[in-house]
């Protein structure tokens, strides 16, 4: 993997933070999807590598069903990209969910 990175140069790098601010009756995953669709303004097809971070407070952990929904949603959006995901905690989030996206597009040197 390291050899591949050494022989490539990033053409584009993008970082977005999307935090859930649910409307009345909206689940936090639905809020993330809405926020992404309405405000993220990302041309998903130009990126070939995506890192997803799903961050919650430990008292309101990410449920397996939420994780499955989010991974499926972003996999469909970045359907040509290789992606990885990870989870983390931040107690300041309370009931909210934070999704951090790090997208990159590499080209051979």
Where on the chain are the PLM-derived regions?
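Tubulin/FtsZ superfamily GTPase core signature
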Residues: 1-109
């Amino acid at each position: 993997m390291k050899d591949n990175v050494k022989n490539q140069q990033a053409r584009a790098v993008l970082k977005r933070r999307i935090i859930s601010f649910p409307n009345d009756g909206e689940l936090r995953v639905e809020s993330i999807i809405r926020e992404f669709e309405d405000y993220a303004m990302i041309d998903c097809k130009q990126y070939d590598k995506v890192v997803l971070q799903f961050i919650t407070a430990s008292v309101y952990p990410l449920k397996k069903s939420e994780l499955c929904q989010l991974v499926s949603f972003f996999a469909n959006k970045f359907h040509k990209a290789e992606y990885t995901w990870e989870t983390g905690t931040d107690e300041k989030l309370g009931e909210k969910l934070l999704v951090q996206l790090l997208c990159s597009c590499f080209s051979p040197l």
